[in-house]
Amino acid sequence: MNAVPLTLWDAFVQAAEAAPDRPALVFEEATVSFSALRKDAERIAQWLASARVGRGDVVAIQLPKRHVTYALWLACLRQGAIYVFLDPRNPPVRTASILKQLKPRVFLTVGDDENPFGETHRLDDSTAEGWLAALPAGGSSQPAPVHGLDPAYIMFTSGSTGEPKGAVIPQQGVLSLMAWVRRSIRPQGEARFSNINPLHFDNAVFDLYGGLLNGATLVPVETSDAANPLIWVKKLRAGRANVIFAVPTLFQTLQQLRLLSARSMPDARVFVFGGEGFPPAALKAFRAAFDDATRLVNVYGPTETSCICSSLEIDAAALAAAGEGFASLGRMHSGFDHLILDEDEMPVETGATGELWIGGANVGLGYVDNADETARRFRQNPTDTRFRSMWYRTGDLVREDRDGLLWFAGRVDNQVKVRGHRIELEEIDLALEALAGVTRAATVTRPGPDGPQLCAAYSASGPVSDETLRSHCMSRLPPYMRPERFLALDVLPQNANGKVNRKAVAALFRADN
């Protein structure tokens, strides 16, 4: 790819024109070339235009990983529309909450959910390809004239108020991410990126943009298959994926099954992981399982900063520096500014712990339909108020050493990571407290064989069975947010100011274990 793309659609067109016959998508049953994918995206873009979808309009996509899903995503980029991937496994009440915030002009779904704010189109495996084939050829209209600060997508994460919150990410942030991948990740020769990450999950941004829009082949693995390591390793081998991005929990599962090896994954050249800490002993075993030519890259970045803002190559020196602790988050990438501030929003000394604030072109535009949370998290640089400058308060506690390496030290709130998913524990508490009879709830994590487990303690006005609690959670929360254990208490432990003492609750679950 030669010229620097000005828009995300430009980037895809450059990739398609540079190698039209190169595989863009490799499924188990079929391969789709870049030229074919471009034609389909242009046909869908014409269909979107007929539905009055243009620059700045929202399109919600709740579909599995199919050829048509990727073409829809690209069609949104061509139209300048803001796309939003939704989890097909979401309970209806959660999907309804998200649609209420988005008010999409068009909603495409595999389920029974309805969009009261615009059109709803149902596309399942039996109808999707027929729908695509019936669309007329793409017209001669020009792509929408989008700009760097125009939103590209909205990504929903857990919210502490009980409702999910949608981070709005601009085109310029994603273009910057793509440039970093070209500089730092892309292997020599033909690049084939995995797409294990669910499309509604932050890490998929790396797969779609760092991979496909940079001209690499994408090897999708359906979310349901990602739960079965034997299946997804087989699919990655069949697709000859050589850049593989997943959360540490998935790689640890492969280790337990003795599948994380050069023999099982002979094409792998770069492993990328992030979203949660990689246990030190497991990371050392991972590094030892491959030769030095195979790269391991630890990445860090909140959803609100376009997926990735720092990284670290995991080699012998990185492991030695970490000792018995977690590896460093690496150094901040070019294009980012960062501050580490104390509780008074003043810079800390080198080596001291404080909250990480991130600035630069990759910072998002706020949260959709959520002015309060936007004002709380997206802030003016408190150390320099002369000029307007949007910074993101991560809530992550870090320290920076004299070499510029960042080290994670905890959270300032009750946000946790489970299998790479950001979870606000208060959202689970509020969901449980919505069940008749439950008077108070407190969710915590405890160590489990496959990473942190969610556990919920509660008080109730009468007996409530675990089965009732699980059924209630299934109706309100996505799978990754559902507690695995419940504990009934007469009164939840409290601290001096009357708030629930989560540390004491966590100790009860550790004792119960």
Regions picked out by a protein language model, each given a short descriptive name:
Residues L63-R66, D87, P187, N197-A204, ...:
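Conserved AMP-binding
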Residues V4, V13, D21-R52, A96, ...:
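Conserved AMP-binding/adenylate-forming core of the ANL superfamily
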Residues K165-R192, D202-N242:
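Conserved AMP-binding/adenylation subdomain of ANL enzymes
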Residues L213-A216, A241-F245, Q255-E324, D337:
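Gly/Ser/Thr-rich phosphate-binding loop
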Residues S33-A36, A152-A179:
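Conserved AMP-binding A3 loop
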Residues A30, Q46-R89, N195-P198:
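Conserved AMP-binding/adenylate-forming
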Residues T7-W9, F107-A144, V174, R295-N298, ...:
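AMP-dependent adenylate-forming
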Residues P20, G139-F156, E163, P187-F193, ...:
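Conserved pre-ATP/AMP-binding loop-to-beta segment of ANL
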